[in-house]
Curated annotation (Swiss-Prot):
Origin species: Rattus norvegicus
Protein localization: Mitochondrion matrix
Molecular function terms from GO: acetyltransferase activity; dihydrolipoyllysine-residue acetyltransferase activity; identical protein binding; nucleotide binding; pyruvate dehydrogenase (NAD+) activity
The protein's name: Dihydrolipoyllysine-residue acetyltransferase component of pyruvate dehydrogenase complex, mitochondrial
Entry-annotated residues carrying N6-acetyllysine: K451
Gene name, Swiss-Prot/TrEMBL: Dlat
Family per record: Belongs to the 2-oxoacid dehydrogenase family.
Phylogenetic lineage: Eukaryota, Metazoa, Chordata, Craniata, Vertebrata
Length: 632
């Protein structure tokens, strides 16, 4: 009776009387304005903010429909025939879901193909459609209910309209009682479900779209609303940037796909650690509907407020260079407010620079928050005059400088980097192999190629390294593998991750199919990816994945170093600087001066044995010392 509509699903074998239709996003369905993630993000069948969660290519299998349809209709003999619709497991990892929206109301007829409801899972928002005609008798789980366990009954449908009235006061408790025993006078009526609060989304509000925080990467569990690009009341045109969200991987901008108006911002700018599925804002189609949402406050975000940065310890005041009395009398200082200090990031920075104790500043911002104006107008209270009692001169105390350190909040990206690096060092048995490579031939070939490409771009030494690494991975595929706990996955294509340092932290954009690309194409890809990485404009598909990683610190003069493996990859190549060295030669002098580069290969010993790692380095060295062999 039900079917699931989602996208990015390759196959599903329908059961008798049921089939699955997977909707596409190319033609947005009618209704409130849809919002999509940055235009560069591949759709993957996911609507980012308007209920569709990005970040998983996991494909639901036939068991989705089996779980959805596997429970036969449970009928209570004291009630007309009806169908109990349970919440199925719509992804391999789903344990609970959120009723994003009911498309049908109680009493309405449901025709074949009608959309009944949208359920937000841990992977995407999945819509249910009817394959048969029926009537919505009772909605048991209100719209907006979060963390509904899999298997919970969410609604009741009946075949005949005259049966709807029998379920007017239907609850799951009353149904259980009816099936367990014969009819008997109830001791007390069951408590009715709590009515939705006046501030909760409901039918009293105009037609609107509640925008929720989706999963923008496979490992994302929360995000930070870095900046709102639109204000309440502003018109949203197609292509406008709505907001920027900092995930555990990068900062991603959301663009508006259809016209509308921003009616309400539910999560203030700068709010950190916002859980997935939290409503972010409200969008309406008509400008006159904006005023209706002035006091709109869904229950999911009533307690969500911007988190204050870690409190700055009060700076130690400089001790005046006067003799210290034997029994000093503490000067009376005004007691600051107890508890948490709410302060904007800019005000906190200014206070640290000026050495101002935030507990003594009275905030004039929303809910008493300290803002820049409060710091600028703050006048510190004068300390009580020192006692005039004479005291024997004592040793002078060296003044302690104010603001000797600053606490830098940890971004989501930095936190994830720390977690993954710790995981790598604790779970992967690293070992390291080093070799010197004569770069003389590469430098000559590079010089000739750049003359040919003059005005079109330049090929760097790093581009030769990427190409040689990719070809070596084809020759020694064990190094182009991944540890998957139960199997070792050997990849047939080489996607080279290139470590790039950005203000937000280290990120590894990917040169896909590096083994079949020419040097000019690799150079163009690297320049584009590095620029986007430093500007924070990388899309998730551009840095998630990869089969082999290169980290180059040679441009900083580092001779050699050992890099940490990027799981689940098995190897990472650390590139050091080139330096001139004397090498034996068959000439009159008996030696030549060569530009020699030191490289170190970090290997996962579970996947790559020492001999295999040495074999890979030999192939890599051969390609660089005779770059013409890259053409074979």
């Amino acid at each position: 009776m039900w079917r699931v509509c989602a996208r990015r699903v390759q196959s599903a074998v329908p059961r008798a009387g049921f089939r699955a239709r997977w909707a596409t996003l190319k033609g947005p369905r009618t209704g409130p304005a849809a919002v999509r993630c940055g235009s560069g993000i591949p759709s993957y069948g996911v609507r980012s903010l308007c209920g569709w969660s990005y970040g998983s290519a996991t494909v639901p299998r036939n068991r989705i429909l089996q779980q959805l349809l596997g429970s036969p209709s449970r009928r209570s003999y004291s009630l007309p025939p009806h169908q109990k619709v349970p919440l199925p497991s719509l992804s391999p990892t789903m344990q609970a879901g959120t009723i994003a929206r009911w498309e049908k109301k109680e009493g309405e007829k449901i025709s074949e193909g009608d959309l009944i409801a949208e359920v937000e899972t841990d992977k995407a928002t999945v819509g249910f459609e009817s394959l048969e005609e029926c009537y919505m008798a009772k909605i048991l789980v209100p719209e907006g209910t979060r963390d509904v366990p899999v298997g919970s009954i969410i609604c009741i449908t009946v075949e005949k309209p005259q049966d709807i009235e029998a379920f007017k006061n239907y609850t799951l408790d009353s149904a259980t009682a009816a099936t367990q025993a014969a009819p008997a006078p109830a001791a007390a009526p069951a408590a009715a479900p709590a009515a939705p609060s006046a501030s909760a989304p409901g039918s009293s509000y105009p037609v609107h779209m509640q925008i929720v925080l989706p999963a923008l990467s496979p490992t994302m569990t929360m995000g930070t609303v870095q900046r709102w690009e639109k204000k309440v009341g502003e018109k949203l045109s197609e292509g406008d940037l709505l907001a920027e969200i900092e995930t555990d991987k990068a900062t991603i901008g959301f663009e508006v796909q259809e016209e509308g108006y921003l009616a309400k911002i539910l999560v203030p700018e700068g709010t950190r650690d916002v859980p997935l599925g939290t409503p972010l804002c409200i969008i309406v189609e008509k400008q006159e509907d904006i005023a209706a949402f002035a006091d709109y406050r869904p229950t999911e975000v009533t307690s969500l407020k911007p988190q204050a940065p870690p409190p700055v310890p009060p700076p130690v005041a400089a001790v005046p260079p006067i003799p210290q009395p034997l029994a000093p009398t503490p000067s009376a200082a005004p007691a600051g407010p107890k508890g948490r200090v709410f302060v904007s990031p800019l005000a906190k920075k200014l206070a640290a620079e000026k050495g101002i104790d935030l507990t003594q500043v009275k905030g004039t911002g929303p809910e008493g928050r300290i803002i820049k104006k409060d710091i600028d107008s703050f006048v510190p209270t004068k300390a009580a005059p020192a006692a005039a009692a004479a005291a024997p001169p004592g040793p002078r105390v060296a003044p302690t400088p104010a603001g000797v350190f600053i606490d830098i909040p940890i971004s989501n990206i930095r936190r994830v980097i720390a977690q993954r690096l710790m995981q790598s060092k604790q779970t992967i048995p690293h070992y390291y192999l080093s070799v010197d490579v004569n770069m003389g031939e590469v430098l000559l070939v590079r010089k000739e190629l750049n003359k040919m490409l003059e005005g079109k771009g330049k090929i760097s030494v790093n581009d030769f390294i990427i190409k040689a690494s990719a070809l070596a991975c084809l020759k020694v595929p064990e190094a182009n593998s991944s540890w998957m706990d139960t199997v070792i996955r050997q990849n047939h294509v080489v996607d080279v991750s290139v470590a790039v340092s950005t203000p937000a932290g280290l990120i590894t954009p990917i040169v896909f199919n590096a083994h079949i690309k020419g040097l000019e194409t690799i150079a163009s890809d690297v320049v584009s990816l590095a620029s986007k990485a430093r500007e924070g404009k990388l899309q998730p598909h551009e840095f998630q994945g990869g089969t082999f990683t290169i980290s180059n610190l040679g441009m900083f003069g580092i001779k050699n170093f050992s890099a940490i493996i990027n799981p689940p990859q098995a190897c990472i190549l650390a590139i050091g600087a080139s330096e001139d060295k004397l090498i034996p030669a068959d000439n009159e002098k008996g030696f030549d001066v060569a530009s020699v580069m030191s490289v170190t290969l970090s290997c996962d010993h579970r996947v790559v044995d020492g001999a295999v790692g040495a074999q890979w380095l030999a192939e890599f060295k051969k390609y660089l010392e005779k770059p013409v062999t890259m053409l074979l």
